[in-house]
Amino acid sequence: MKRFFIGCIRLYQKFISPLTPPTCRFYPTCSHYGIEAIQRFGVLKGGWLTIKRISKCHPFHRGGIDPVPEKKQEK
């Protein structure tokens, strides 16, 4: 399942993203954030983090550096 969603993001990066001017207000970009979040947390939590991140990527948000959170260590 992870591979499918990461593959969708990579298809977007390769074929759709080059057709539009760069507009992401964050570092790393939202698509890179999505890949890293899904790799680190899985499809559900990583997907949720990605949706939250994309919802903040608009002209009224100042953007900036917003890395994927670290995974909490289990005790």
From Swiss-Prot:
Predominant location: membrane
Entries under InterPro entries matching the protein: Membr_insert_effic_factor_YidD
Localization (cell): Cell membrane
Record bears the keyword Nucleotide-binding: no
Keywords, alphabetical: Cell membrane, Membrane
Membrane topology designation: Peripheral membrane protein
Cited function: Could be involved in insertion of integral membrane proteins into the membrane.
Family: Belongs to the UPF0161 family.
Family matches, as NCBIfam families: membrane protein insertion efficiency factor YidD
Protein name: Putative membrane protein insertion efficiency factor
Lineage of source species: Bacteria, Bacillati, Bacillota, Bacilli, Bacillales
